[in-house]
Amino acid sequence: MNKQFYIESMHNNLHILFAMGVIQDEMYKCPLCMQSFSDDEVVKNLTEEDVPQASLGGKRISLTCRSCNSTCGHSIDVNLLNAIVGLEQRKFFPSTDRKVNLIHEGQRLGANLHIDADRQLFLEIDAKRNNPKVWDEYRENILKENALIDLQDVPLKRDERLISAALLKNAYLLLFARTGYTFLADSYYDDLRMQISNPKPYILPERLWTLQNISVADGIYLCRDNRLRGFFVVYTLSKVMQYRVCVFIPSPNVPYLAATYHLRNILAYDRIRVEIMPSYFDFFNERNAIARLRKWCYGWDKF
């Protein structure tokens, strides 16, 4: 990520929007919490954000404040990673490792389970990390040839609400990295930002996202159905396997509740009219492109 180029592009976007009377000032705002920062503070206090997180194949595409970056990383992002890891652990992929517990008559022994390229299983036990008496008991009386032992994965922290917030955050920042503040500065999106920063309460209706084998390429798609006027953001999470995510972010003309109602009523073989957001439009530096996107977001005409 070219941080200086990114900052200059965002400043140009803010300058144009300020001249159009859309925003109150030209100060950079963290896209997640909308806190304002001076030019000096942007360089010092904003950090590069991987979208999706680096552990799931993401790249640095945005700048967020240290508070949002840290909070998201330690709360919602880890839940999304653990959800993917948990799915893949069930498949026992070759050349992978995981932490497990051995359980025998109420005694627990921690270990690392290694699955080699031929899918043979090997237990690696770190004696220093276990109770010495428990380890002695396992070594001398339990871990015998052909012994039956209950093997359990170490539980991973997973919360559906936090996973949902992480999926929304990724889509929101992908859209922001493409369009800047052009329309996302609207207070309409405060609820979306609040849902990301405070996942537990139901601020937005469920569900604006889906995890399916989507046939279209990653990208941002404009929906041509006015009932769902907004953006389908499609992206991929990568671990051992790849997982396609599609998130719908409505335009300010479409209430969130109405959007989820129409999304729920889409049948398996229904066709949704969409078009890829044209790559040749520069929503940071070209006033005409910014005006055109805003007209589409706040009106009902074609893009």
Language-model regions, residue ranges each:
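Short, flexible, mixed-charge glycine/proline-rich loop motifs
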Residues: 15-27, 53-59
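Short Cys/His-rich Zn2+-coordinating modules
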Residues: 5-19, 44-51
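C-terminal, charged low-complexity interaction regions
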Residues: 136-303
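Short cysteine-rich clusters marking metal-coordination/redox-active sites
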Residues: 30-33, 65-68
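Histidine-centered nuclease catalytic patch
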Residues: 37-61
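Short microdomains enriched in Cys/His and/or Lys/Arg
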Residues: 52-67, 86-99
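Cys/His-rich microdomains that often coordinate metals
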Residues: 37-39, 69-72
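Polybasic, low-complexity binding patches
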Residues: 72-115
